[in-house]
């Protein structure tokens, strides 16, 4: 059970980081 929860946390964290980087790149492109 703990492994499933920790895996989900890692998955959500990775998705959040990807979204933040993607949005940051979009804003950077718009600024240029």
Curated annotation (Swiss-Prot):
Compartments, record wording: Plastid, Chloroplast thylakoid membrane
Membrane topology annotation: Single-pass membrane protein
Endpoints of the signal sequence: none
Spans through the membrane: 4-24
A Gene Ontology biological process term: photosynthesis
Highest rank taxon of the organism: Eukaryota
GO cellular component: chloroplast thylakoid membrane; cytochrome b6f complex
GO MF, any single term: electron transporter, transferring electrons within cytochrome b6/f complex of photosystem II activity
Keyword terms, alphabetized: Chloroplast, Electron transport, Membrane, Photosynthesis, Plastid, Thylakoid, Transmembrane, Transmembrane helix, Transport
Major location (coarse): plastid
Family, per entry: Belongs to the PetL family.
Subunit (UniProt): The 4 large subunits of the cytochrome b6-f complex are cytochrome b6, subunit IV (17 kDa polypeptide, PetD), cytochrome f and the Rieske protein, while the 4 small subunits are PetG, PetL, PetM and PetN. The complex functions as a dimer.
Purpose: Component of the cytochrome b6-f complex, which mediates electron transfer between photosystem II (PSII) and photosystem I (PSI), cyclic electron flow around PSI, and state transitions. PetL is important for photoautotrophic growth as well as for electron transfer efficiency and stability of the cytochrome b6-f complex.
Protein name as catalogued: Cytochrome b6-f complex subunit 6
